[in-house]
């Protein structure tokens, strides 16, 4: 990678840590329970981040791996569903594995590199031009969803995500009120 992608990936890594950190300590029941009227659960949002964000944008769009973009066109609603026989541990493991694969794709990428694939069947008139823009898009989406998880976690048990300055290397963590 280069300095620009390193900086963007560093910010993305902090948001990924936020997602995992705010969910730490929740029971399987709380992870599966919808809290907001829209009906998604914390595990469903984590599955969305795994399939529709980490796997789709990095291996699918940037690297052009087959079936990644096809997974999104198959129906994103299914990606917000966690089967009863899929444990929370499996959902978390899938997310971590998707991050590792995404990081490997990014390590081989350049900011100005064109995407290897684009799902024109989903977005025929919209396109992100390069890896830089894709990474910014993903960073924005993960940050938005980490905020959603913050609100839900606070509603569940009063825990909020607090921490020092992430740019100063201070540890971040969840704090129960």
Which residues does each PLM region occupy?
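Short, contiguous pre-domain boundary segments
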Residues: 1-2
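Acidic/histidine-rich alpha-helical segments that form the ligand environment
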Residues: 78-119, 130-143
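Short, contiguous alpha-helical
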Residues: 5, 9-24, 28-78, 119-177
């Amino acid at each position: 990678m280069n300095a620009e992608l390193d900086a963007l990936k560093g910010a993305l890594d902090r948001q990924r840590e936020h997602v995992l950190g705010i969910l730490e300590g929740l029971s399987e029941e709380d992870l599966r329970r919808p809290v907001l009227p829209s009906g998604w659960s914390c595990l469903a949002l984590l599955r969305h981040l795994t399939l529709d964000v980490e796997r789709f944008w990095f291996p699918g769009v940037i690297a052009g791996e087959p079936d990644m973009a096809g997974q999104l066109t198959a129906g994103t609603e299914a990606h917000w569903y966690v089967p009863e026989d899929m444990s929370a541990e499996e959902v978390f493991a899938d997310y971590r594995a998707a991050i590792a694969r995404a990081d490997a794709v990014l390590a081989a990428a350049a900011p100005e590199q064109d995407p290897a694939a684009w799902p024109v069947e989903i977005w025929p008139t919209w396109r992100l031009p390069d890896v830089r823009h894709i990474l910014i898009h993903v960073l924005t989406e993960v940050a938005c969803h980490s905020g959603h998880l913050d609100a839900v976690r606070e509603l569940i048990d009063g825990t909020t995500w607090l921490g020092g300055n992430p740019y100063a290397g201070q540890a971040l963590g969840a704090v129960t009120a």
